[in-house]
């Protein structure tokens, strides 16, 4: 029906955190890229570490909380506090946070909070 070898999969349905998805097998002609990514919002450093460790296993770390899993799919592992730190009306605080996270691969929540407060790492 889909012109692929018998037994191959054309679509897969899955659910993440209550959100339903359908993935289409585009074959070798369509590769994953950063235009499509999943964001995982984490409350704690432990959650950041958990998802980072598991998703980079067989994959690759990227800058600023980005990574690719072993299938080449892009993910962003983001502390929920980041928005609050970046949207502070005090521009100096948000600039320090931005400067700090631009140097990170995996987000370090304690380091972001120190930057926000103007404390040295």
What kind of feature is each model-predicted range?
Residues 1-121:
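Glyoxalase I/VOC metalloenzyme domain signal
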